[in-house]
Amino acid sequence: QDVLEVGCGMGGFAARFQSIVNGVSYTAIDQSPRMVELARARGIDARHGDVQSLEFPDASFDLVVANWMLYHVPDLPKALSEIVRVLRPGGALVAATMGDDMHTELWSLINSGDATPELSFSAESGADALRPWFAAVERIDLHGATVFPSRDDVEAYIRSTMTRGHLVDELPHITVPFRARTTNSVFVAT
């Protein structure tokens, strides 16, 4: 089995996957040279790459993993066409993403109470994005919560987001630990 992870970040998922699944060849890519460096430090075969222009031959992988990253891609159809191109017949894409109501309790405190900004690939829109490219699409919903032990943790999380980091100063007084509901979905597309 040959696995490709696109948008591998620091390699945490890749390391965990390889520790519990034996006999796979695992390749990971990320656009950030720093993320590639950190993934390599974990022993991951990580390479600099762009999901919109994969540098692999057609039909190279049995599985492509895309965890919480497809909503960052400027041209989602191009990325999906590349994923389909490198998948072998019978292969699958497993893509995780968040729901539009992710951390509503937090975001309602800042930025005029807006929910999470609309994502190009979310729990709500993911199936529609995948259906033109795959014969079967299954959505598995995961509900939970993030518990932030301190205000510093909440602020650090806000700063880490691409769309809301600049709003950290709008955060009013909060009671900690602070709890925010999570909604995530995993899509399995074949």
What spans do the regions from the language model cover?
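A short glycine-rich, Lys/Arg-flanked "PGG" loop and its adjoining helix->strand segment in the class I
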Residues: 77-89
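A conserved beta-strand element that flanks and buttresses the S-adenosyl-L-methionine
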Residues: 65
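Conserved class I S-adenosyl-L-methionine
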Residues: 92-121
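Short amphipathic alpha-helix with an adjacent loop that forms part of the alpha/beta core around
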Residues: 56-58
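Short catalytic micro-motifs in class I SAM-dependent methyltransferases
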Residues: 68-69
